[in-house]
Swiss-Prot record:
Residues 214-216 form a propeptide. GTP binds at residues 20-26, 37-38, 40, 42-43, 69, 124-125, 127, 155-156. It comes from Homo sapiens. Pfam families: Ras. Its EC number is 3.6.5.2. It is a lipid-anchor. GO terms for biological process: amyloid-beta clearance by transcytosis; astral microtubule organization; early endosome to recycling endosome transport; establishment of protein localization to membrane; establishment of protein localization to organelle; establishment of vesicle localization; exocytosis; exosomal secretion. Interacts (GTP-bound form) with RAB11FIPs (via their C-termini) including RAB11FIP1, RAB11FIP2, RAB11FIP3, RAB11FIP4 and RAB11FIP5 effectors. Interacts with RAB11FIP5 and STXBP6. Interacts with SGSM1, SGSM2 and SGSM3. Interacts with EXOC6 in a GTP-dependent manner. Forms a complex with RAB11FIP3 and dynein intermediate chain DYNC1LI1; the interaction between RAB11A1 and RAB11FIP3 is direct; the complex regulates endocytic trafficking. Interacts with EVI5; EVI5 and RAB11FIP3 may be mutually exclusive and compete for binding RAB11A. Interacts with STXBP6. Interacts with VIPAS39. This is Ras-related protein Rab-11A.
């Protein structure tokens, strides 16, 4: 049973990055609306869509942002990355140049996004296996070397699209919830929370002194 879109426990912003034409918009539409458009044109500017999933009984609302990979849209970079807690870095398994550019996209992401952002490398268009130009093992090794998770997907036939988003959102949730638990523990152990106020009656030194020998 689905939840109302305005009822959620966590809201996570996830960005899609990578060269134009690698299938970012179709990954977004496949996950959020279960749609695929063969005539999909390059995204102009920025668009985002939302979908909620359940993790550990909590409702996670994913706000997934998509933008064109072409150089002329670079001006939106800072606003695009601001507040993002996850990123899918997408390349086309049938176009090696889109994989070569992953390193540049990763640098831009790390220059502009939060240092703790969760990143997944996504080899899209796995249905084009007969045209494969990027070996799976090569991409997986790159991901491991750079601390990224890795998956191959096909927005066309839906392969691993659900798994990609579920995996990154679950990882973000684990990190956020662990941080919340850690923060609570620190608060519980902080000196201010262990102080028991003690009322100390005024000592004789603090009592007002009675002046004597007046009016003599």
């Amino acid at each position: 049973m689905g939840t109302r879109d305005d009822e959620y426990d966590y809201l996570f912003k996830v960005v899609l990055i990578g060269d134009s034409g690698v299938g970012k918009s179709n990954l977004l539409s496949r996950f959020t609306r279960n749609e695929f458009n063969l005539e999909s044109k390059s995204t102009i500017g920025v668009e985002f869509a939302t979908r909620s999933i359940q993790v550990d009984g909590k409702t996670i609302k994913a706000q997934i942002w998509d933008t064109a990979g072409q150089e002329r849209y670079r001006a939106i970079t800072s606003a695009y990355y601001r507040g993002a807690v996850g990123a899918l870095l997408v390349y086309d398994i049938a176009k090696h140049l889109t994989y070569e550019n992953v390193e540049r996209w990763l640098k831009e992401l790390r220059d502009h996004a939060d240092s703790n952002i969760v990143i997944m490398l996504v080899g899209n268009k796995s249905d084009l296996r007969h045209l494969r130009a990027v070996p799976t093992d090569e991409a997986r090794a790159f991901a491991e070397k750079n601390g990224l998770s890795f998956i191959e997907t096909s927005a066309l036939d839906s392969t691993n699209v659900e798994a990609a988003f579920q995996t990154i959102l679950t990882e973000i949730y684990r990190i956020v919830s662990q941080k919340q638990m850690s923060d609570r523990r620190e608060n519980d152990m902080s000196p201010s929370n262990n102080v028991v106020p003690i009322h100390v009656p005024p000592t004789t030194e603090n009592k007002p002194k009675v002046q004597c020998c007046q009016n003599i």
